[in-house]
A protein has these predicted regions:
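A short, conserved alpha-helix within the catalytic core of class I
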Residues: 31-41
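A short acidic, Gly/Pro-enriched loop at the edge of an enzyme's catalytic core
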Residues: 11-23
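A short beta-strand submotif of the Rossmann-like class I SAM-dependent methyltransferase core
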Residues: 22-26, 34
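Conserved Class I S-adenosyl-L-methionine
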Residues: 89-175
Length: 175
């Protein structure tokens, strides 16, 4: 199978009309320019095409290890806005109403297995640390986070997350 890798803003990725059966967006949906994207997706999806949106987050108000990790993130990055997640539906901007109909929506809990090392890696990769801090700050955070995990977490554990999924079907007759 030949797969072409393309790095481009979703709103103007160049594909012929009616190319895809399904387009997915996982974790990135809030960052799009929705007025542009809704129309563009409608164009590149086949006549019975779907747009699936997924989001997943740990629940620090219900999971002690996640809460302690977030507390440490906030010590290093007090301006981080990705904290204190709670279960919520994916908000779909009105721009999609003209082009799509809601077909399915689900919200559910999932216990995600981690080791101390994999949880440290997951936290280090979050935008509050890996995308925001200097290399020296990341190293200091990681040292402190690993020490914290030694104190509060067994070698293997689960972190409570919620997942939200929406599937929208392309409206006919607008091409």
């Amino acid at each position: 199978m030949e797969i072409t890798f393309l790095c481009a803003p979703a709103e103007n990725a160049q594909f012929p009309g009616q190319t895809f059966d399904v387009v997915t967006a996982c974790q990135c949906f809030p960052y799009f320019r929705h007025e542009e994207l809704a129309k563009h997706l409608h164009t590149i999806l086949k006549s019975d095409g779907r747009f699936a949106i997924m989001y997943m987050a740990w629940l620090p108000l219900e999971d002690r290890i996640a809460a302690k990790s977030e507390e440490l993130i906030l010590q290093y990055n007090p301006d981080w806005t990705g904290c204190n997640e709670v279960r919520r539906r994916i908000g779909i901007p009105d721009a999609y109403d003209a082009y799509f109909t809601l077909e399915e929506e689900e919200l559910f809990d999932i216990a995600v297995p981690f080791t101390r090392d994999s949880w440290n890696g997951r936290i280090k990769a979050c935008r509050g640390i890996g995308a925001s801090l200097s290399e020296a700050e990341i190293e200091a955070f990681e040292k402190e986070h690993r020490s914290l995990l030694q104190q509060i977490a067994p070698e293997e554990f689960e972190i409570l997350h919620y997942a939200a999924i929406i599937v929208m079907r392309k409206k006919p007759g607008l091409d």
